[in-house]
From Swiss-Prot:
Biased composition (Low complexity): 22-34
Residue ranges, compositional bias (Acidic residues): 47-77, 111-136
Annotated InterPro entries: DUF3627, KilA/APSES_HTH, KilA_N
Region ranges (Disordered): 1-137
Segments forming a coiled coil: 290-338
Annotated KilA-N domain residues: 175-284
Protein's UniProt name: Putative KilA-N domain-containing protein L37
Swiss-Prot/TrEMBL keywords: Coiled coil
Basic residues bias: start-end ranges: 1-12
A Pfam entry, by short name: DUF3627
Length: 487
């Protein structure tokens, strides 16, 4: 806006543009360095305000646009009134809410034009103007901060990072709020986090899909039953319908569903969103397993780093001892002896780690080749021997070491020899069933808890005061110890 001077009296510059300058020709005087600082601070304030407001929805942006238009019209009216009046000695333009960049440039040019007419003013006046400018700019900054604080009151804070209500950014009323679910807006209940799936389906799909179409599918019914079972909420309580004719509530009416159902409903309505959900789940599972591997590797790296630190320390000590040849030889011999101990410890540790790694095998991707260890109770009846034959020794238990793909055939052969046999214990997964049973048998025989079969390495009897319950407990303990990762 270009300000014209009156022929009778000097015009008074508005507080919003001059930030507290004096009336008359003195109010038009400011140094070029003050003007550049003035323009730079204005740009930082309004750029910051624009950046903060862009994160809110289109309703806030529309409101700000209408405010800017009304502010521009107000400035235009003031300009015409100043030019037409010859007797008015003072005028005042209200401070606009925001000065667009094109008006900011025009304002700067006008001030530069006015400066050329008052170059002979004293430096003291310029100093006063700069002081007033700083005060008013600080006031403007405070106003911008107050605006941002008022907007931040709409955001709902929650201490639980897994609560779905963390997506809320603005309240509609005491029950319903707006939220951002992925890349689109949703309506969410404040007290329980239920989301309006009717509106979501309308938003994400171009086809005429309805919520009841999804709910009637067999997959949806099974999912609803599962969510109800896990959460303890009745099936009817997983959905809340808001049906009202009120104009105010039209925006929020529809069916609100439990948060655990929403990803499946939206994936059904939008293939694009379904792909995003698959990507998130796959990334989560991959990262989870990756973190486990990283922890295992880190444990080994820490041990190696500790050994390396010890060796480095010894090497450093060796380099520091060079006072005399005798003393040096003595120190070297001592350090060599210690180094040999460390190296021996390192080799022993490395051997143990290698052995542990071979046994600590992760789960196989092929279930058919996974091993199982099954302890069977034979329940055989004693058979009277024929004349001239020795009585056949009866064993109470048999250890079966099988793979999943041959389990059926192995069990058939067992039941053929032991029709009344029953399962006592099953280890569903073990890296090596043969190795596990050999280790169990060796420990149980040494502790005099079982008597092994003479010709069969898998048949055995329990010794007195050693029960079947204790047998199961010991085998599980040995199995868990083998699968435990090294510390």
């Amino acid at each position: 806006m270009k300000v014209q001077k009156s022929s009778k009296k000097p015009l008074k510059r508005s507080a919003s543009f001059t930030n507290g300058t004096k009336s008359g020709s003195k109010s038009m005087k400011s140094s070029k360095s003050s003007l550049k600082s003035h323009k730079k601070i204005y740009k930082e304030i309004f750029d910051s305000e624009i950046s903060d407001n862009e994160s809110f929805d289109s309703e806030i942006s529309d409101s700000e646009s209408s405010d800017n238009e009304s502010s521009d019209n107000e400035s235009s009216d003031n300009e015409s009134s100043v030019e037409s009046s010859d007797e008015e000695s003072e005028y005042e333009i209200k401070k606009p809410r925001r000065i667009p960049s094109q008006y900011s440039k025009k304002f700067t040019d006008n001030v530069l034009d006015d400066e050329s007419d008052d170059d002979n003013q004293s430096d003291n006046e310029s100093s006063d103007i700069n002081s007033d400018d700083d005060n008013n700019l600080n006031e403007l900054k405070n106003n911008v901060i107050e605006v941002n604080k008022s907007l931040s009151k709409n955001i709902i804070s929650n201490g639980d990072i897994t609560d779905i209500r963390n997506i809320i950014y603005e309240k509609i009323d005491k029950e319903i709020s707006k939220g951002i679910y992925g890349t689109f807006n949703v309506l969410i209940m404040i007290h329980n986090g239920y989301i309006n799936v009717t509106k979501v389906i309308q938003y994400v799909t171009t086809k005429k899909k309805k919520f009841n179409d999804w709910k009637s599918t067999k997959q949806a019914q099974e999912l609803i039953e599962e969510v109800s079972s896990v959460t303890g909420i009745p099936v009817a309580g997983l959905f809340i319908a808001k049906n009202t004719g009120s104009k105010k509530i039209t925006e929020i009416r529809g069916t609100y569903a439990h948060p655990d159902l929403v990803p499946h409903i939206v994936s059904w309505a939008s293939a694009k969103f379904g792909h995003k959900v698959s990507k998130i789940v796959n990334d989560y599972m991959s990262k989870k397993m990756f973190d486990k591997h990283e922890q295992l590797i880190k444990g080994k790296d820490d041990k190696i780093a500790e050994l390396t630190r010890k060796i480095d320390k010894q090497t450093s000590l060796m380099k520091d001892q060079k006072s005399t040849i005798k003393e040096q030889d003595k120190k070297i011999n001592e350090l060599l002896s210690k180094s040999n101990e460390v190296l021996g410890y390192a080799k022993d540790t490395n051997r143990k780690i290698t052995h542990v790694v071979k046994e600590r095998v992760p789960y196989s991707d092929e279930p058919k080749i996974e091993h199982q260890l099954i302890i069977m109770k034979n329940n055989d009846e004693p058979i009277k021997p024929k004349k001239g034959e020795k009585a056949k020794k009866i064993y109470g238990y048999t250890a079966l070491r099988i793979m999943n793909k041959s389990k059926s055939a192995t069990m058939n052969r067992y039941y053929k020899d032991h029709p009344d046999g029953e399962t006592v214990l099953t280890i569903d997964y073990t890296p090596n069933a043969m190795h596990l049973w050999n280790q169990c048998k060796m420990e149980l025989i040494e502790d005099e808890k079982i008597r092994p079969g003479g010709t069969s390495c898998s048949s055995f009897n329990l010794r007195k005061e050693y029960s079947e319950r204790k047998l199961k407990k010991d085998i599980k303990r040995i199995h868990n110890l083998r699968l435990k990762h090294p510390e």
